[in-house]
């Protein structure tokens, strides 16, 4: 089983997909039926759809196979030769069946091979089966040696918490041998932790006819388990094993013994669980029908009117019936599964699918035993047949789960035993699936929300299988989907007093008796009913998020569980953020209006609407509220309901929603009141809320450009390619751009691409064409000034236009410029057109990016959480010191778009925070080398094109960058356009994966803890200071702070921010870092936060780079002379070069350890607490004097004789 964990994490290795031509040319070769192929090895089952035909002996006559195309040509030449045709053997019946099954059942041979390999990895190793068999023999002998007698006090604690304990229990040794149950019996054990369930039946002599009442049976079962455990511990065969008690399925009435063997060969992955059961004939079956009561009110000292009927205890009755009917149900499963490898493998596929989604956990879990019973049910109904393959078993179960309704009840009982009681029994449960006895509901504890979620996941699996353009295997089986990543909001209540308050004041006596005073299901029912009534269409599902109970030592007292609850809310994006809840009309339905007013309390008010109706209504906000505020409406409703109906204080509740939206809010240090604009700006605004202002301004500018008179050429199209146009700019864009001294100053520029009409008068020389473009831009600027009164400025990149406080950079796009960039003349004078980095960059910016930008804008319109998810993701990457030169911003946008496009969840993401968590999962668990991220916008890619691209990617992986992204607009550059080999590099991808895994661990830890506080943004959005060799601190007054919320630095503390407006389009620090990387990337890696970061972290390359080497003229870059005529790259020399390049920005250099020590020792730490007085002169002095003085103070020391580095010389 050592490989099980590996296969669940990584999945099977990538298999090359043959081109379509090859698939149609020869079906046998496409399906891998070559006689020498490894696929010819017999599979483990003859009925699972995966066994290859047994190879037949070859004829004695030798034949020669020609390679590749030569073989095809030879076949065509010999098309009509009868002698060669005689050598072609017709396919056998087995081969025909194999071809038909592969064509009908699977997408491709790749999907079939992946499923087959996974099933082979999941098979139990022989050492485990042998150990289990030997253990069962030993345990059987042990039970026969047990002696009858009175159970006295022992060192062990009885693993059951009850109010009234019994005494005088007499132990009787088992009369029936222990038996394997569950997966161990059906042959479907699943790792990596193999749990073997063993049932030991308690004889009837231990029980009396009235023990079904008031938890007496449960106490005797726990005492029986305690006695057996005590005897096992004293037996030499088990004395070295580890013993612990636990609750089965988080049910405090179901204690089991967990035994971990001491044998080294199995102790790491094997665990045995001992269940105590009772004979089915112990009690009358009629005692446990759902409408009977088996826990009297007097047991809890409650008073009950004798004239009233006792409340039903259907859930407790089902708990006892589970033990009584276990043997009968297990016999049915054994009959269906033993010897049928296809059913066993099908159930294994379903168990992997269910476990990856965490829907089988806890008290309310949809266990795998339900799936096993459902397979038997489908076989009884003749929907599944004995010859169905394992794939058909899994697919049929998913299809039937998605299209059948269990709320009305289904049953395994024989037809003769089915009565009209099925519908009656279904009325006592949310979901009803009766067992073979017709008495036990296998889904007694499954709430309706969990069942509907299972159905939705099953429907998604079928849809993925039906999508012929997609390899659905990783989405169904490989991707781990924790439940907290599937929900949009989480409600968490862990305060003990609040839990007890809800149980005492709001739990009905019937619920207490029904669940034997177990608090968790009572809380779940109270909260679910209340929230469903209040939220209505705003939520699609309310799901319990359970943590599996932990085992405890057998000497310790049984813990009390169920004292906390977590609920996950899956929101409906169409209705979740509506600001109004409208009640019934007070005139037409006064009773309904009064009930509405009572339910909502003081929040409800009588209102008159535009249609003249007068109704009660609750208003949660205004239509003008920012999207981030609207996303908190559900939180506002839930908190009000809990306070109004359950009297809970807000301090005792944690509602997890939009905590991470803080990272793209406007910094409180920046005051919007100082911005001169006609726009209404709020101090608590954010980047998402400000984006529409920029988009509206751009639309107005586009109209003005189209309306310009007397232009030499007509403007055909205008496209914005800035991130803000697709709601992907994480920095708040404020209307603060200004014209100062004939220059435009702005913190952001919005890039606009203008396409002109066709003309044959453009010059054929590149520099002349660009000069003409500049002249055209100048004319546009002059006309904008004359006709629209807009200020403008020309730069080497394009035309800067100032409008309403926003700065736009206009660029002209013309096909001829792209052709001239590609043009090359060979030595023979032949002109050809070849792609090069410059031409690709121009084609991307002018022609592809406008289309992709429009597609991403449309994606945000259909999924409003897409934009804010990108904002959070970009901020997280930036705070990990990953700037645009290391990780392209478009890579983040496309990866998040891939999340929103792929159908790996039944519901769309409604909350940006959930989208970000899924983005972290994508970074943490992606196979960068084997995965090509395809974005098929508007489904414009055909299946053939997708197949060809995937084949090219797998067959020529080295020609693609480490992170391969492809959109349907990339044309021939698909997979190579948005990233490069160094941006991001494979090392950076590995680094980001580690960071993402660490962030997910922090999130999971905070969710699983009893602490009400969710992980703080400052914990997630602050990079680590570990691993860096040097930190260069920059002058804080020369590096403007970002307008977004400052989450701090991993190196130093906060200081007074500055918000200087730089020249439009200028980023001096980014330019310097680019120079450093161009010149010194072979010796050091450079990291900084592009969102206002004021430190430059340096990581040296491995020591081998700095070792002395022989003197060579061609290898003197950054070298210094050393002994014996050798040269060496000296780190100190490089540091001096860094200082020279940084010039005025450089403040000081130190190691991270020194900074930590200074922070600990400094009493009043600031962001730059060691700056010299000369560097902090009064702001009244001119900037030139200030920079000159700082440069003089920080002038580099004189160096010894060395060879000046060539990169530095060239840069100067």
UniProtKB/Swiss-Prot annotation:
Tell me where in or outside the cell this protein is found: Nucleus, Nucleolus; Chromosome
Specify the domain of life of the species encoding this protein. Eukaryota
- Gene3D superfamilies for the chain: 1.10.1410.10, 3.30.70.3030
Write one Gene Ontology MF term: RNA binding
For this entry, list what GO says about its biological process.
ribosomal small subunit biogenesis; rRNA processing; tRNA export from nucleus
Sorted alphabetically, the keyword list is:
Chromosome, Nucleus, RNA-binding
- Residue ranges of the region described as Disordered: 1-72, 1156-1212
Q: Where along the chain is composition biased (Basic residues)?
A: 1197-1212
- Establish whether keyword Ligase is in the entry: no
Q: Name one GO cellular component term.
A: CURI complex
Provide the primary localization.
nucleus
Q: Which family does it belong to?
A: Belongs to the NRAP family.
Q: How does it assemble?
A: Part of the small subunit (SSU) processome, composed of more than 70 proteins and the RNA chaperone small nucleolar RNA (snoRNA) U3.
Annotated function = Part of the small subunit (SSU) processome, first precursor of the small eukaryotic ribosomal subunit. During the assembly of the SSU processome in the nucleolus, many ribosome biogenesis factors, an RNA chaperone and ribosomal proteins associate with the nascent pre-rRNA and work in concert to generate RNA folding, modifications, rearrangements and cleavage as well as targeted degradation of pre-ribosomal RNA by the RNA exosome.
Protein name per Swiss-Prot or TrEMBL? Nucleolar protein 6
């Amino acid at each position: 089983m050592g490989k099980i964990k590996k296969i669940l994490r990584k999945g099977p290795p990538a298999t090359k997909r043959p081109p379509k031509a090859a698939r149609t040319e020869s079906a046998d070769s496409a399906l891998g039926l070559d006689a020498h192929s490894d696929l010819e090895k017999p599979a483990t089952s003859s009925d699972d759809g995966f066994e290859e035909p047994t190879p037949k002996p070859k004829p004695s006559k030798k034949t020669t196979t020609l390679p590749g195309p030569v073989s095809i040509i030879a076949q065509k030449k010999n098309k009509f030769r009868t002698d060669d045709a005689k050598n072609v053997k017709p396919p056998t019946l087995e081969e025909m069946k194999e071809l038909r099954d592969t064509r009908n059942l699977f997408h491709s041979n790749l999907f079939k091979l992946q499923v087959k390999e996974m099933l082979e990895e999941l098979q139990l190793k022989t050492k485990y089966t042998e150990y289990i068999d030997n253990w069962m023999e030993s345990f059987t002998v042990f039970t026969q040696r047990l002696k009858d007698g009175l159970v006295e006090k022992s060192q062990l604690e009885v693993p059951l918490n009850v109010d009234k304990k019994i005494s005088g229990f007499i132990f009787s040794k088992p009369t029936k041998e222990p038996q394997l149950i569950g997966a161990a019996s059906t042959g479907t054990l699943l790792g990596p932790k193999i749990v073997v369930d063993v049932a030991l039946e308690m004889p009837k002599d231990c029980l009396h006819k009235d023990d079904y009442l008031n938890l007496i049976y449960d106490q005797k079962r726990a005492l029986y388990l305690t006695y057996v455990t005590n005897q096992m511990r004293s037996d030499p065969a088990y004395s070295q094993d580890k013993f612990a008690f636990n609750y089965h399925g988080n049910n405090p009435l179901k204690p089991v013994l967990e035994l971990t063997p001491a044998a080294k060969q199995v102790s790491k992955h094997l665990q045995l669980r001992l269940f105590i059961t009772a004979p089915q004939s112990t009690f009358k079956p009629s005692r446990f029908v759902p409408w009977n009561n088996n826990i009297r009110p007097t047991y809890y000292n409650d008073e009950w009117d004798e004239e009233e009927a006792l409340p039903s205890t259907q859930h407790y009755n089902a708990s006892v019936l589970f033990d009584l009917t276990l043997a009968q149900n297990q016999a049915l499963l054994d009959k269906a599964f033993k010897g049928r490898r296809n059913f066993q493998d099908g159930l294994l596929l379903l168990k992997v699918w269910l476990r990856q989604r965490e829907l089988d956990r806890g008290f309310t879990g949809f266990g795998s035993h339900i799936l096993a019973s459902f397979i038997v049910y489908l076989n009884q109904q003749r929907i599944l047949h004995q010859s169905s393959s394992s794939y058909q078993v899994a697919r049929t179960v998913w299809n039937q789960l998605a299209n059948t309704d269990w709320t009305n009840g289904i049953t395994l009982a024989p037809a003769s035993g089915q009565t009209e009681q099925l519908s009656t029994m279904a009325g006592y449960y949310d979901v009803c699936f009766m067992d073979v006895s017709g008495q036990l509901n296998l889904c007694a504890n499954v709430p309706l929300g969990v069942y509907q979620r299972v159905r939705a996941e099953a429907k998604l699996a079928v849809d993925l299988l039906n999508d012929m353009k997609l390899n659905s295997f990783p989405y169904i089986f490989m991707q781990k989907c924790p439940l907290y990543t599937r929900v949009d909001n989480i409600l968490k209540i862990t305060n003990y007093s609040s839990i007890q308050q809800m149980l005492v004041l709001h739990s009905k006596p019937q619920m207490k008796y029904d669940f034997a005073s177990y608090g968790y299901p009572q809380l779940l029912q109270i909260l679910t009913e209340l929230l469903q009534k209040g939220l209505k269409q705003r939520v699609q599902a309310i799901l319990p998020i359970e943590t599996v109970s932990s085992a405890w030592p057998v000497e310790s007292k049984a813990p009390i569980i169920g004292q906390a609850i977590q609920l996950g809310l899956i929101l409906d994006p169409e209705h979740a953020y509506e600001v109004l809840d409208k009640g019934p009309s007070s005139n037409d339905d006064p009773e309904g209006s009064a009930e509405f007013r009572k339910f909502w309390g003081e929040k409800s008010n009588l209102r008159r609407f535009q249609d003249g109706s007068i109704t009660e209504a609750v208003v949660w906000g205004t239509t003008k509220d920012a999207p981030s505020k609207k996303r908190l409406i559900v939180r506002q409703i839930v908190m009000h309901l809990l306070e109004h109906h359950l009297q809970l204080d807000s301090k005792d509740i944690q509602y997890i929603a939009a905590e991470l939206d803080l990272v793209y809010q406007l910094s409180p240090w920046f005051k919007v009141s100082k911005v001169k604009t006609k726009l209404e700006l709020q101090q608590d605004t954010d980047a998402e809320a400000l984006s529409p202002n920029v988009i509206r301004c751009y639309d107005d500018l586009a109209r003005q450009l189209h309306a310009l008179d007397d232009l030499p050429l007509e403007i055909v199209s205008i496209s914005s390619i800035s991130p803000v146009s697709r709601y992907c700019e994480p920095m708040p864009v404020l209307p603060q751009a200004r014209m100062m001294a004939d220059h435009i100053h702005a913190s952001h520029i919005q890039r606009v691409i203008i396409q002109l009409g066709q003309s044959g008068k453009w010059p054929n020389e590149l520099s002349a064409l660009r000069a003409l473009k500049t002249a055209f831009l100048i004319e546009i600027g002059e006309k904008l000034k004359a006709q629209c009164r807009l200020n403008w400025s020309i730069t080497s990149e394009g035309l800067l236009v100032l409008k309403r406080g926003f700065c736009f950079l206009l660029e002209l796009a013309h096909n001829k410029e792209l052709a001239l960039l590609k043009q090359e003349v060979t030595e023979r004078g032949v002109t050809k057109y070849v792609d090069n980095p410059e031409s690709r960059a121009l084609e991307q910016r002018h022609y592809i990016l406008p289309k992709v930008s429009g597609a991403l804008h449309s994606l945000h319109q259909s999924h409003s959480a897409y934009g804010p998810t990108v904002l959070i993701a970009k901020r997280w990457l930036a705070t990990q010191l990953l700037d645009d030169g290391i990780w392209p911003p478009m890579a983040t946008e496309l990866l998040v778009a891939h999340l929103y496009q792929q159908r790996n969840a039944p519901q769309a993401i409604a909350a940006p925070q959930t989208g970000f968590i899924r983005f972290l999962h994508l970074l943490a668990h992606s196979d960068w080398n084997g995965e090509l991220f395809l974005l098929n916008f508007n489904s414009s890619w055909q299946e053939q094109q997708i197949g060809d691209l995937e084949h090219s990617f797998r067959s020529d992986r080295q020609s693609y960058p480490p992170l391969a992204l492809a959109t349907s607009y990339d044309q021939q550059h698909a997979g190579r356009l948005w990233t490069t080999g160094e941006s991001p590099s494979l090392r950076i991808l590995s680094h980001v994966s580690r960071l993402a895994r660490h962030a997910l661990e922090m999130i999971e830890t905070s969710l699983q803890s009893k602490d009400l506080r969710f992980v703080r943004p400052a914990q997630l959005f602050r990079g680590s200071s570990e691993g860096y060799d040097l930190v260069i601190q920059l002058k804080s007054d020369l590096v403007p702070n970002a307008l977004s919320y400052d989450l701090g630095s991993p190196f130093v503390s906060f200081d007074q921010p500055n918000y200087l407006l730089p020249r439009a389009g200028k980023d001096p620090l980014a330019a310097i870092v680019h120079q450093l990387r161009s010149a010194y990337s072979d010796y050091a890696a450079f990291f900084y936060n592009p969102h206002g970061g004021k430190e430059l972290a340096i990581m040296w390359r491995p020591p081998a780079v700095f070792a002395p080497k022989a003197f060579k003229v061609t290898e003197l870059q950054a070298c210094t002379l050393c002994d014996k005529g050798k040269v060496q790259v000296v780190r100190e020399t490089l540091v001096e070069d860094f200082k020279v390049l940084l010039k005025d920005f450089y403040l000081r250099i130190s190691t991270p350890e020194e900074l930590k020590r200074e922070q600990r020792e400094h009493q009043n730490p600031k962001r730059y607490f060691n700056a010299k007085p000369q560097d902090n002169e009064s702001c009244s002095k001119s900037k030139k004097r200030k920079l000159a003085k700082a440069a003089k103070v920080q002038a580099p020391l004189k160096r010894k004789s060395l060879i000046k580095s060539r990169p530095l010389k060239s840069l100067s």
